[in-house]
Amino acid sequence: MRTDRDNWDINTSVGSTALFVAASRALEATKPAPLAADQYAEVFCRAAGGEWAELVAGGVPEHPLRSEDFGQYFVSFQGARTRYFDTYFGKAIEAGVKQVVILASGLDSRAYRLDWAPGTTVFELDQPLVHQFKREALDQHGAEPKAVRAEISVDLREDWGKALQDKGFDPSEPSAWLVEGLLIYLPADAQERLFESIDQLAAPGSFVGIEQMTTYADVVFAMLVAGANESGDQANSDFFSLIYNEQRSEAATWFRCHGWDSERTELLDYLNFSGRTLPEPSQPAWYMFNSISLVSAVKG
């Protein structure tokens, strides 16, 4: 159960979801034609050890990420989501943006993967123990970032704007923001404050990329929670205990109303466009995927 001031490392609470997602990206990268190839996802899993290291080594056949009714689709989802936001950042790079802010950066490796313009700084905001795990894993692997990387240890439910500026962020210059895999772990009022902070800190010409998950109807949410608990799948049960299923602002509309040119792509449409098999409406993955949209916007 979440509390207003809970915190975590890479193995607990919200932090543990980063390993689940990294493992998905690692499995996607092994496909003959991956939607995205994150070479560092496997590094994180091996550094975590245990089932994560075994999974990327080809073991743990019963792992939820190998299941036919959910796992195979979730792996494709992570490939699609990664590709979408990699492409989004490519547009920001082409526009000359040299300030990048990744909120709840987790095990995001874009500071190491993408070809940033010289002079770019990637600001990564997350819990201190998450930063520590990521830094140590990449250092041991000998990885070198392709931009200046600035770690900011902060709770995104609090005022993080000052901490960002203290690290050298300049609100008078354009920036590119990423809100990926975050909003469902925030209460609705915290999301509102997050959007307001981005808008206040972003100069004209700035970009924002957001993953949005529509609130489930109460009856659907109760059904999904009951199904997760009955399945014995601890990861699935934990997911529903971590998220806030609250009515909240729709991202594309919010930013459009605040002077941004925004566009929204439904995840199912993007997966279909990418040539991936979609889950059937009777499968658990369908309820999740049908509620997810990918948003990008540019500030006028």
Curated annotation (Swiss-Prot):
InterPro entries in alphabetical order: Ppm1/Ppm2/Tcmp, SAM-dependent_MTases_sf, SAM_mthyl_Trfase_ML2640-like
Record key words, sorted: Methyltransferase, S-adenosyl-L-methionine, Transferase
Keyword Nuclease among UniProt keywords: no
EC number(s) per entry: 2.1.1.-
Residues given in the record as S-adenosyl-L-methionine binding sites: D126, D155, L156
Pfam families the UniProt entry points to: LCM (PF04072)
Signal peptide annotation: none
GO terms assigned for molecular function: methyltransferase activity
Top-level enzyme category: transferase
Coiled-coil boundaries: none
GO process annotations (BP): methylation
UniProt family annotation: Belongs to the UPF0677 family.
The protein's role, per its UniProt record: Exhibits S-adenosyl-L-methionine-dependent methyltransferase activity.
Matching NCBIfam families: mthyl_TIGR00027
Name recorded for this polypeptide: Putative S-adenosyl-L-methionine-dependent methyltransferase MAB_4328c
